[in-house]
């Protein structure tokens, strides 16, 4: 399994996927791309990516209009240089706390905090199977099987515990 991120797919045929001028053969292609900005944002006067219509935001979530904040997969959040935060649930989850604080800070006229995404790796599940890649603190680059399935469940349980309660996360474990 090879996971590629950050490249625009220009074409797909029955044998190959094309990333710009380069082609790569595939047996099974799972394409999870296509994230675009919402129509109201696309039609706004805010600075946005012309291709995806996602809003450009500074690391404090402010857009070209300092009264408008953007977060999650609706935004290209500056991470320094030419880098933007990935449009993942993990990034949105960690960004949300700082973005929420910044809304309050903006209302009070206080300085805004910057946010920097820390990539902790990727865990993907398809049906009963899972694969994990580049997971922080684990010396193996890519792995699957029981370890990846357990990691994926633990990520979901952590989220449930955070938004609900640890008791609910424990009771949901067997259904994940």
Q: Where does each model-flagged region fall?
A:
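General small-molecule cofactor/ligand-binding pocket signal
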Residues: 2-4, 69
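A conserved short coil-to-beta-strand element within the FAD-binding core of flavoproteins
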Residues: 5-16
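FAD-site-proximal beta/loop scaffold in flavoenzymes
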Residues: 15-94
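Internal hydrophobic alpha-helix adjacent to the cofactor/substrate pocket in enzyme cavities
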Residues: 90-117
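C-terminal auxiliary extensions adjacent to catalytic cores
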Residues: 128-176
């Amino acid at each position: 399994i090879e996971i590629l991120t950050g490249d625009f797919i220009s074409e797909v045929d029955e044998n190959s996927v094309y990333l710009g001028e380069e082609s790569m053969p595939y047996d099974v292609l799972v394409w999870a791309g296509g994230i675009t900005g919402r129509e109201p944002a696309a039609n706004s006067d805010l600075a946005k990516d012309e291709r995806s219509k996602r809003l450009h935001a500074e690391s404090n979530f402010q857009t070209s209009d300092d009264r408008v904040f953007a977060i999650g997969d609706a935004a290209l959040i500056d991470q320094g240089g030419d880098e933007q935060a990935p449009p993942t649930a993990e990034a949105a989850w960690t960004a949300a706390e700082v973005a929420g604080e910044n809304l309050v800070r903006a209302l009070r006229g206080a300085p805004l905090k910057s946010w920097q995404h820390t990539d902790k790796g990727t865990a993907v599940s398809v049906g009963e199977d899972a694969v994990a890649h580049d997971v922080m603190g684990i010396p193996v680059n890519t792995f699957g099987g029981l370890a990846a399935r357990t990691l994926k469940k633990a990520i979901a349980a952590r989220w449930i515990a955070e938004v609900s309660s640890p008791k609910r996360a424990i009771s949901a474990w067997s259904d994940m």
